[in-house]
């Protein structure tokens, strides 16, 4: 803007001249600010504020300048003045919250977050601030995971991968890099050496085949056939990271080798490089549309990318192409199951194990689907689980062990899991391991059945006497390794969920074996002696007939360690909203039409209420759920969908919710604990099996039995009655953290002591030649014992 000359100024009123002068000063201040002349800019902003103290832009810009200068506390009044003039300015809210955070005024910062959200401020900038506020230390990336709780497909491609590529009609030639100098011909491996590799591979002499393939690549670098031999050997040996690099190199020479490309696609999928897997699958299908494996791997990759309709279509196409392939049927069943269609998934999974009774992945997925179906009786579930055990225990090893039968000696405890990363199982396990690793009478040995590691993996590994990644070991080899390691008690942390090694445990490699945390039910295996639980989830004598294992009742099923510096509990939203907000943060595959129908009954009975649904991953999820509500007469305008988010942002989303509504028959567990920690109780529908009791067990721990219903009508009545009593809800909300901290699950040392007692009692019985029995594992310390009794009552 150019300065006005005297004639122009003469035509302006004094007020207009004043406004023009202020605008010119502001323009100059902003220019000086952008040029880095901060002292000059500050002086100009202050001059404006001397004239107009409520000038919104000057207040905001000066506040930003002060924050950038490390003077956050001084900036706060200027942000507040700017917001007073323009309370809908999202950028100003973010700056204000950031200033409060940097000034270490955390309670005020959290209040400001809530106020901003009430004014419609959302988005990445605010979410990023919430994450910083809740986690002021180093933030680590989350581990990729396709499914947090359910089975996944980790089986390899069932193909004759030793078949050799066709000889090339002409030798491959490097392009050369020195002008027009002739390129150096690539030396090709002799056919007899490639055939020798194929013979070793076909005879499953995998170590020799891999060694020979490495030598071939060393002797004939750049030879596509040698690289291919190494790639397929690495695939079988499950050395996936190296396999990917070698396969890409091989395909430069052998671009038409669809078999190798299929193996590469599957390996990329296993390493969660899903976009690359999709690219490879589509390249195969473009050349060979009837390639069943390409469609199958594509379906699983698309599922991991949360493109569910495409995933189902790809898996259905795989079944059409190969209706008698167990892998195709199993993949379709898995994808349907992980979308929450348990009843639709079960026939496909059952078909897979009819085709191949040794398909343990599909068999575990079938059992996982059955516990999600509330039409299945406990007797039927036990029978189905026993069938798994009976079949896979055919290879059980003779029960002779070299372990010393000294009842008081230090014990070697093994943990087997594919979830030793940023996963609910690992979060339960870590605080227990931190305690047990300090016990001189125990040494901890981990067998990790996954290829992905993260910061949680590193924390667990730090407490391990030994740590082995066992993805490359077959069940017989892993069982032999565990026996050679002289493990005294082996603990399965998966049950019938993804990446389990139950078939290894079916061989009984350790004298005593137990299952814990990963699965809410029996494994069905007689080779697993104990199921670790507590007296609330599995009261003495109440659910024993649903288990093959004997039940050990610890002070708590597992500990809960709240995230450090997570958001505080806020006031009850209904008190300022004027209406009640229900909520759900359960994983989406627990949400089905009958679950939505029950929630809709609550919303119909409480017509002014609203609902927040979290963990939304894509627009299609939102549209599907909104459609189910609409079919029940609920206006989608009453629904708010929150995206899947980082832990701090997810926890802060509870600030908008008064009461959570639970899923059924597979109730919440970690989600319920997180909600309790954020002051939000959950109305749950408890039944007569562990999957239905997850939330109920935690609610009983904090004396909130009033939120537990036993049929659908009672669920609706309780959800309405509790919403009508806002004073009680506010009292519960404000005191929930104190209740939590008074209960055993929030004391990892108590749970760890209970586990330590349980392990020693199991061992003493084995040393005495006594059969496993159900028992209570009570820590010897009377104070912790009293805490356990208090919280169980």
PLM region spans:
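Alpha-helical solenoid repeat scaffolds of the TPR/TPR-like class and their adjacent stem/linker regions
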Residues: 1-579, 597, 627-634, 646-659, ...
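Short hydrophobic "strand-cap" motifs at the C-terminus of beta-strands
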Residues: 416, 585-586, 614, 642
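Glycosyltransferase donor-sugar binding loop
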Residues: 447-452, 610-623
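Substrate-binding clefts and catalytic carboxylate motifs of secreted carbohydrate-active enzymes
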Residues: 583-594
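Donor-sugar nucleotide-binding helix/loop cap in glycosyltransferases
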Residues: 661, 675
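Active-site donor-sugar recognition loop in glycosyltransferases
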Residues: 663-670, 690-691
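Short glycine/serine-rich donor-binding loops of glycosyltransferases
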Residues: 671-672, 695
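Short acidic/histidine- and often glycine-rich active-site loop of Leloir-type glycosyltransferases
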Residues: 692-703
């Amino acid at each position: 803007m150019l300065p006005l000359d005297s004639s122009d100024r003469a035509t302006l009123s004094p007020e207009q001249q004043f406004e023009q002068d202020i605008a010119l000063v502001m323009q100059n201040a902003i220019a000086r600010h952008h040029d880095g002349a901060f002292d000059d800019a500050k002086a100009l902003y202050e001059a404006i504020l001397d004239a107009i103290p409520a000038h919104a832009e000057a207040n905001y810009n000066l506040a930003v300048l002060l924050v950038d200068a490390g003077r956050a506390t001084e900036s706060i009044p200027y942000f507040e003045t700017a917001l007073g003039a323009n309370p809908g300015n999202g950028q100003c809210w973010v700056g204000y919250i950031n200033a409060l955070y940097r000034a270490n005024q955390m309670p005020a910062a959290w209040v400001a977050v809530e106020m901003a959200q009430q004014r419609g401020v959302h988005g990445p900038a605010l979410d990023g601030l919430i994450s910083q506020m809740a986690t002021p230390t180093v933030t680590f990336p989350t581990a990729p995971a396709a499914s947090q709780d359910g089975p996944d497909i980790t089986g390899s491609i069932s193909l004759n991968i030793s078949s050799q590529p066709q000889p090339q009609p002409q030798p491959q030639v490097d392009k050369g890099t020195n002008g027009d100098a002739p390129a150096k011909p690539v030396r090709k491996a002799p056919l007899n050496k490639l055939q020798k590799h194929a013979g070793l591979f076909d005879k499953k002499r995998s170590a020799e085949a891999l060694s020979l393939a490495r030598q071939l690549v060393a002797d004939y670098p750049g030879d596509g056939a040698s690289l291919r031999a190494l790639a397929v050997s690495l695939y079988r040996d499950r050395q996936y990271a190296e396999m990917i690099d070698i396969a890409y190199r091989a395909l430069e020479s052998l671009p038409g080798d669809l078999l190798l490309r299929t193996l590469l696609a599957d390996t990329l999928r296993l390493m969660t490089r899903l976009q690359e897997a999709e690219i490879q699958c589509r390249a195969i299908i473009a050349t060979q549309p009837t390639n069943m494996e390409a469609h199958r791997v594509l379906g699983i990759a698309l599922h991991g990318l949360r493109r569910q309709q495409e995933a189902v279509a790809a898996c259905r196409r795989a079944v059409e192409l190969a209706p008698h392939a167990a892998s195709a049927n199993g993949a379709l069943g898995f994808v349907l199951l992980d979308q929450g269609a348990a009843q639709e998934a079960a026939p496909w999974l059952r078909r897979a194990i009819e085709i191949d009774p040794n398909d343990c992945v599909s068999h575990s997925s079938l059992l996982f689907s059955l516990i999600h179906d509330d039409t299945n009786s406990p007797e039927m579930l036990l029978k189905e689980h026993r069938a798994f055990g009976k079949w896979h225990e055919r290879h059980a090893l003779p029960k002779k062990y070299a372990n010393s039968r000294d009842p008081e000696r230090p014990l070697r405890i093994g943990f087997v899991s594919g979830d030793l990363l940023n996963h609910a199982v690992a979060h339960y396990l870590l605080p227990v391991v931190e305690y047990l690793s300090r016990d001189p009478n125990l040494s901890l040995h981990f067998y990790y059945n996954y290829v992905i590691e993260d910061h949680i993996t590193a924390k667990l590994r730090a407490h391990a006497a030994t740590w082995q990644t066992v993805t490359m070991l077959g069940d017989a080899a892993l069982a032999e390794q565990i026996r050679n390691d002289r493990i005294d008690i082996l603990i399965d942390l998966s049950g019938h969920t993804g990446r389990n090694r139950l078939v290894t445990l079916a061989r009984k490699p350790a004298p005593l074996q137990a299952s814990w945390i990963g699965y809410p039910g029996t494994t069905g295996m007689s080779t697993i002696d104990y199921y670790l639980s507590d007296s609330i989830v599995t009261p003495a004598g109440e659910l024993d007939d649903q288990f093959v294992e004997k039940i050990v009742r610890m002070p708590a099923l597992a500990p809960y360690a709240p995230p450090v510096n997570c958001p505080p509990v806020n006031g009850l939203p209904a008190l300022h909203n004027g209406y009640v907000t229900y909520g759900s943060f359960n994983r989406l595959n627990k949400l089905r039409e009958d679950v939505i129908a029950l929630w809709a009954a609550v919303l119909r009975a409480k017509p002014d209420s609203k609902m927040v649904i979290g963990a939304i991953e894509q627009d299609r999820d939102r549209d599907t759920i909104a459609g189910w509500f609409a079919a029940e007469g609920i206006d989608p305008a009453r629904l708010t969908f929150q995206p899947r988010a980082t832990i701090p942002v997810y926890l802060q989303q509870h600030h908008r919710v008064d009461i959570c509504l639970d899923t059924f028959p597979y109730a919440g567990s970690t989600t319920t604990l997180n909600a309790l920690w954020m002051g939000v109780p959950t109305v749950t529908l408890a039944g007569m099996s562990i999957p239905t009791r997850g939330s109920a067990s935690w609610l009983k721990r904090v004396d909130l039995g009033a939120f537990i219903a036993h049929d659908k009508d009672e669920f609706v009545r309780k959800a309405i009655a509790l919403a009508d009593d806002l004073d009680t809800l506010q009292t519960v909300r404000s005191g929930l953290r104190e209740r939590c901290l008074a209960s055993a699950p929030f004391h990892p040392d108590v749970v760890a002591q209970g586990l330590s007692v349980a392990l020693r009692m199991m061992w003493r019985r084995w040393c005495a030649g006594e059969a496993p029995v159900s028992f209570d594992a009570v820590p010897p310390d009377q104070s912790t014992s009293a805490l356990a009794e208090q919280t169980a009552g």
